[in-house]
Amino acid sequence: MNISLTKTQKTLIQSSGDIARIMRQILLRENRMSRQREHVWTIGLNDEFKMLYVELIAFGIPAKDKVQPMEIYRLPLQKDAKYLYICHNRKTNDMSAMSDDKALTDRMIQVGNIVGIKVFDHIIINSKTEDYLSYHDIGLMDELRKSLKWVPKFEQAEKIKQMAVQEALKKDRIAIAKTLKKNKTDIKVIMQATGLTAEDIAKLK
């Protein structure tokens, strides 16, 4: 689920604290009960380190078990993101890096290597306080980038590459459809030219 951002939140990210602050603001939009449940988000940044989007990729307990790294990269590929942040909340005061958190980050790094998007950090925010942990700040991201544990097998790597190609082609089709729509081209012609559905075309601005 794509999360709406305010103009002030679509800003230049200069530190892990910037991400933690914005994600805490997003978490606080929810009611008290929902805040205590685990959320996993990804944050896409452009090459100038400005936020492009925030996406909620999993919610509930255990949220991280629902995460499929290959699927997560569809939106950053569509948005042309260059950097990806992972963020999740924790309701306990233990802000240490757990083994399942590190495994998720490791897997995301390996898929990112294939599609050309760098996983820059994994940030854990506290649901009740302003405490947070940044893997980048404590040097854990450098350690995980050296890991070979989750390097995809050849067949998996080829599927991931194919997904990246398909998303790039889709982005081109969307650009063409936007131009045709702007020129008031008949929607049936746009559908034939791009392969997009009428519903997809209607959403384009």
Predicted feature descriptions by range:
Residues M1-K79, D100-V111, V115-K118, K128-E155, ...:
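N-terminal beta-strand/alpha-helix entry module and adjacent surface
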Residues Y73-Y83, A164-N183:
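Surface-exposed, interaction-prone regions with an acidic/low-complexity signature
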Residues Y83-K91:
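Glycine- and acidic-rich phosphate- and metal-coordinating loops
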Residues R90, I124-N126, T194:
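Conserved beta-strand edge residues that scaffold enzyme active sites
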Residues T92-S96:
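Short, solvent-exposed loop/turn segments at secondary-structure junctions
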Residues D121:
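Beta-strand-loop-alpha "switch" segments that mediate conformational coupling across diverse proteins
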Residues K153-K171, Q192:
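A cross-taxonomic marker for long C-terminal extensions/tails that follow the last structured domain
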Residues K170-K205:
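Elongated, amphipathic alpha-helical interaction scaffolds
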